[in-house]
Amino acid sequence: MIELLLFGIILGLISCVLAGLFVSAYYQYKRNR
């Protein structure tokens, strides 16, 4: 049960980091145009 919880937390963190990177890259792209 603990492993499943840890897996969910790690998955959430990775998705949050990816979303942050995507948004920052998108803003940089819009600003540079």
Swiss-Prot record:
Keywords: Chloroplast, Electron transport, Membrane, Photosynthesis, Plastid, Thylakoid, Transmembrane, Transmembrane helix, Transport
Membrane topology, record value: Single-pass membrane protein
Broad class of where this protein is predominantly found: plastid
Cellular component, GO annotation: chloroplast thylakoid membrane; cytochrome b6f complex
Membrane-spanning residues: 5-25
Entry's localization field: Plastid, Chloroplast thylakoid membrane
Pfam families: PetG (PF02529)
Swiss-Prot/TrEMBL GO biological process terms: cytochrome complex assembly; photosynthesis
GO molecular function, one term: electron transporter, transferring electrons within cytochrome b6/f complex of photosystem II activity
InterPro entries in the record: Cyt_6/f_cplx_su5, Cyt_6/f_cplx_su5_sf
Family (UniProt): Belongs to the PetG family.
Function description: Component of the cytochrome b6-f complex, which mediates electron transfer between photosystem II (PSII) and photosystem I (PSI), cyclic electron flow around PSI, and state transitions. PetG is required for either the stability or assembly of the cytochrome b6-f complex.
Record note on quaternary structure: The 4 large subunits of the cytochrome b6-f complex are cytochrome b6, subunit IV (17 kDa polypeptide, PetD), cytochrome f and the Rieske protein, while the 4 small subunits are PetG, PetL, PetM and PetN. The complex functions as a dimer.
Protein name per its UniProtKB record: Cytochrome b6-f complex subunit 5
Species in which this protein is naturally found: Bigelowiella natans (Pedinomonas minutissima)
Gene transcribed to yield this protein: petG
